[in-house]
A protein has these predicted regions:
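Domain-scale recognition of functional cores that engage charged ligands
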Residues: 216-224
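Electropositive, gly/pro-rich neighborhoods at or near active sites that engage anionic ligands
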Residues: 1-167
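Cofactor-binding loop segments of dinucleotide-utilizing enzymes, especially the Rossmann-like FAD-
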Residues: 138, 173, 241
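Short glycine-rich phosphate-binding loop at a beta-alpha junction
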Residues: 82-83, 213-216
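C-terminal functional extensions of proteins
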Residues: 225-287
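Glycine-rich phosphate-binding "P-loop"
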Residues: 103-109, 166-201
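Short, well-structured alpha-helical segments in soluble
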Residues: 66-74, 198-210
Length: 287
């Protein structure tokens, strides 16, 4: 585990762009179904609904999901390293997919994406020092605000987790219609009505206020956004749902976690702007 943490650090020490990724469980379910049933497969509606609800891909139609699969697999090719094998039910299917798409990759453990699990000397986050860093997440604004409380959140670990010289650039992402139910604070801005347009929205934000490093946690959009940013010379790491933890933003999912729950103190906050149907996402696990 520590050796792989050093490997992640080595990517950040180098000035080259890279993509360090991870596959979410819902993404793996859809990809496995596609591989098993062939390119002309019709996805079951329940699976397409899951991809929208849990991972933000909309609309939940055959055409939309087919396009997402092709773009996602294409984006995987940009991965230099990936946290894999953590989702036990589809571990073998994931390995077969990655072996065919990116045979030459650095394989990581899921925890290698989360620097607070490691000693200061092997935390990749310390290399964010003096960099412009984009936070691409639904709670990006809260995350950025929390950086001003870094010392209160992380104590003497703060400089190696949220360096005080980092310039943070929040790019707020939103929720699919099934979750946001038209709420202005949590819906993608009009006229966005498909997952492809959400990618364009995020990239437009990057062009307006560029950064050198991106920390991403935005469901099944993340790998595609990450691949596009890597092509634009950005160093990218997909932390997934754990993104908020780095910034002292807690959620139900971690309240009983044997390690992460011990980090919580009065400086930690819950996310603002809960979408109408947040409970559909694992009983509002991020709030």
């Amino acid at each position: 585990m520590e050796e792989k943490a050093e490997l992640v650090c080595s990517y950040f020490k180098n000035n080259k762009s890279f993509l360090i990724g991870r596959n979410g469980s819902t993404e793996l379910e859809v990809l496995s179904y596609y591989i098993k049933n062939g390119p002309n497969t019709q996805f079951p509606q329940f699976l397409m609904n899951r991809l929208e609800t849990y991972s933000g891909i909309f609309p939940a139609t055959q055409e939309s999901v087919q396009r997402w699969v092709l773009r996602y697999v294409d984006s995987l090719k940009e991965c230099d390293a990936i946290a894999e094998g953590w989702y036990e039910p589809l571990k073998m299917e994931e390995k077969a997919l990655l072996d065919s798409v990116i045979p030459k990759r650095d394989s990581l453990f899921l925890r290698n994406l989360e620097p607070y699990y490691f000693d200061e000397s092997i935390r990749w986050s310390k290399y964010l020092d003096k960099k412009n860093v984009g936070i691409i997440n639904s709670f990006a604004n809260t995350c950025e605000e929390q950086t001003y409380l870094a010392k209160a959140i992380w104590g003497d670990k703060s400089e190696s987790l949220l360096p005080s010289t980092t310039h943070w650039i929040p790019i707020k992402t939103y929720f699919p219609p099934k979750i946001s139910m038209g709420s202005k604070e949590t819906s993608w801005p009009s006229p966005i009505n498909s997952w492809e347009q959400t990618i364009d929205y995020v990239l437009k934000s990057f062009y307006e206020d560029p950064f050198e490093v991106a920390i991403i946690g935005c469901g099944a959009l993340g790998m595609i956004i990450g691949a596009e940013l890597k092509k634009l010379n950005v160093q990218v790491i997909l932390m997934g749902g754990a993104t908020q933890i780095l910034f002292g933003v807690k959620g139900k999912r971690w309240e009983t976690h044997n390690i992460i729950s011990t980090f919580f103190n009065d400086a930690w906050v819950y996310p603002m702007n809960k979408p109408v149907n947040a409970k559909l996402i694992e009983n509002a696990c991020y709030w």
